[in-house]
Design a protein with these regions (language model features):
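Propeptide-to-catalytic entry region of secreted or membrane-anchored zinc metalloproteases
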Residues: 40-249
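Phospho-regulatory, Ser/Thr- and acidic-rich intrinsically disordered linkers and terminal tails
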Residues: 45-56, 68, 182, 272-273, ...
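N-terminal secretory signal peptides that target proteins for export/translocation
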Residues: 1-19
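The catalytic-center signature of Zn2+-dependent metalloproteases
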Residues: 277-374
């Protein structure tokens, strides 16, 4: 089976930001890594994560706070506000009551060190290495071509959404033109993000893999995991797959993702970054449309945004481009305040978007040889 049919569906990049599809063959990945002499543990196949059977009672979810000590993080009080906002948004926009277990805190290195390096290696071949300037532009464009093909809304809807964010006056749906545009804006804006500085004066995006979306995609490989992971890490990168169009508009910045997690209660987990809510770097503020947040508002908006990922996790909803009333509608750039004011549960239902049907989002998990021996 082709990886562009399956691997890329391992996750939904949200914020309400989404990311799906990896445009490479599984055998090609294995051969590439073998040629490099790397020890890898590539998947034998891929399996569809079923739509979860939700309990009738209140849904309880475990929570981890994964912290990069170099970056500003939410306080305990802000985390409480964030989780309260998620509870509220879930009840209003998803129709389910949720509660959270006590938050457990980990350093980013501590949380990821238990993931086998061999299971990270096959993902590394899919990373566009913008740090060393060794990316393959054609492969990136092809990844966007695949993302365009697999949208679940009419082309005019996603094209209009994207055109507004790049200043394109005339909206067209030409696939070739758009895959080039998406690659252009992705790399141009990622270059701006690469220049962000942390409080210590050093680049936020350093030589660690902490910023790489593929690094975060490996979370589901943990033997013991959490349903909800909150982090202060900036995740901004480029890949040869798992791309989605609204992430391109932000230069590959991803606020959150819902992905496979066999050990999690419902077979998936979500992670959500608070970086875009705490940073006041001019690049981030511009992406927020000039929005600046006090700590309490930042936490509340972060929770409303994270509820988007709950929709992926609980119902496997897609992205209803063109219906901003839906909590599942991708947030334009990072304008979370603007987006929150447009939410209207009744109007979302009335719109009857095909992306709001349970199970429309296909999430795939890798299957390894070791899994078959259990």
């Amino acid at each position: 089976m082709l990886a562009n049919d399956v691997v890329g569906l391992m996750a939904r990049r949200g914020g309400g930001l989404g990311r799906i599809r990896i445009a490479v063959l599984v055998l090609s990945i294995t051969a590439m890594l073998a040629a490099c002499g790397e020890r890898v543990q590539p998947p034998l196949s891929f399996a569809l994560v079923p739509l979860p059977a939700l309990p009738k009672e209140v849904i309880r979810l475990s929570v981890a706070h994964v912290v990069n000590p170099r970056l500003e993080k939410f306080s305990d009080a802000q985390l409480a506000v964030l989780l309260d906002a998620m509870r509220t948004a879930s009840k209003v926009h998803l129709g389910r009551e949720i509660e959270f277990d006590r938050v457990e805190t980990f350093s980013i290195d501590e949380y990821f060190k238990v993931i086998p390096a061999s299971r990270q290696a096959w993902r590394n071949s899919m990373i566009y290495d913008f740090k060393k300037g060794k990316g393959d532009r054609v492969k990136l464009e092809d990844a966007y071509g695949l993302a365009i093909d697999q949208q679940t809304v009419p082309a005019r809807d996603w094209a209009a959404f994207a055109a507004r964010e790049i200043g394109l006056e005339k909206v067209d749906t030409d696939r070739t033109a758009w895959k080039i545009r998406f690659a252009d804006v992705h790399l141009q804006r990622l270059a701006l993000l690469a220049n962000l500085k942390a409080a210590d004066g050093k680049p936020v995006i350093d030589q660690t893999p902490h910023n790489e979306w593929m690094f975060w995609n490996s979370l589901g490989e943990r033997e013991h995991t959490h349903d909800v992971i909150i982090t202060n890490q900036l995740v901004a990168s480029a890949e040869y797959g798992a791309v989605d169009i609204h992430s391109a508009l932000r230069g590959g910045l991803t606020s959150g993702t819902t992905a496979f997690a066999p050990q999690a209660r419902f077979g998936t987990q979500l992670w959500w970054s608070t970086f875009a809510f705490t940073s006041n770097d001019p690049v981030i503020v511009e992406m927020r449309g000039g929005e600046k947040y006090e700590p309490a508002e930042a936490a509340w908006l972060a929770g409303i945004g994270a509820a988007h990922e709950l929709g992926h996790l609980l119902f496997q909803y897609g992205h209803p481009f063109g219906v901003p009333a839906c909590v599942m509608s991708p947030t334009p750039m990072l304008r979370f305040r603007e987006q929150s004011r447009k939410l209207d549960a009744g109007a979302c239902v009335a719109a009857q978007s095909p992306s709001m049907k349970p199970g429309v989002l296909r999430i795939i998990r890798p299957v390894y040889a070791a899994d078959l021996k259990r």
